[in-house]
């Protein structure tokens, strides 16, 4: 359910684009992203950092898109957000006792420090590559292809990557259990 909630602005953007075009889709994504942050706050009394970062950039770049009537701004939004995530993940290797991925999952999974480090770096690299891939699609394909890639392409890539990470975690968590006996 959370996955659907996280993807709701993208789904609304996609549907609005298919019926009314890029500018209505941009405005719809701006409104739905603001609603997403508000609903999360009302329900949990806290903000989800991912939602807030996305909201900031969708409001900023969405406004530029609407004011200048140029879709390039909204097309750059995923790349900027992905690269911010990559920088934060990579930077977490140098600040604090544990990497960001370790801090997020340590209550649920027990892994060796080296495995946490590899997981964190793989997520940073994944987001870096997603940002580059988004720009490749932006500059080499039409807007319709980009919108389809933004929803379906990144969703499939994310699911495949998460599945790969799950297998990697399972292998190392199992090794940890065997070694502790």
Curated annotation (Swiss-Prot):
Coiled-coil segments on the chain, per record: none
Name assigned to this protein: Inner membrane-spanning protein YciB
Superkingdom of origin: Bacteria
Organism in which the protein naturally occurs: Coxiella burnetii (strain CbuG_Q212) (Coxiella burnetii (strain Q212))
Pfam families, per database record: IspA
Role description: Plays a role in cell envelope biogenesis, maintenance of cell envelope integrity and membrane homeostasis.
Record-annotated membrane-spanning stretches: 8-28, 53-73, 76-96, 121-141, 149-169
Gene name for this UniProt entry: yciB
Keyword Transmembrane: yes
């Amino acid at each position: 359910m959370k996955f659907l909630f996280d993807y709701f602005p993208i789904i609304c953007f996609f549907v609005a684009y298919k019926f009314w075009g890029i500018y209505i889709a941009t405005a719809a994504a701006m409104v739905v992203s603001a609603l997403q942050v508000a609903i999360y706050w009302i329900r949990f009394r806290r903000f989800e950092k991912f939602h807030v970062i996305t909201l900031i950039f969708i409001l900023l770049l969405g406004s530029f898109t609407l004011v200048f009537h140029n879709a390039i701004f909204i097309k750059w939004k995923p790349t900027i957000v992905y690269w911010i995530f990559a920088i934060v993940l990579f930077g977490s290797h140098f600040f604090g006792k544990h990497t960001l991925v370790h801090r997020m999952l340590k209550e649920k999974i027990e892994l060796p420090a080296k495995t946490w480090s590899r997981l964190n770096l793989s997520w940073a690299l994944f987001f870096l590559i997603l940002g580059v891939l988004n720009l490749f699609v932006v500059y080499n394909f039409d807007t319709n292809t980009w919108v389809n890639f933004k929803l379906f392409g990144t969703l499939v890539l994310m699911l495949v990557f998460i599945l790969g990470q799950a297998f990697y975690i399972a292998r190392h968590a199992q090794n940890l259990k065997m070694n502790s006996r």
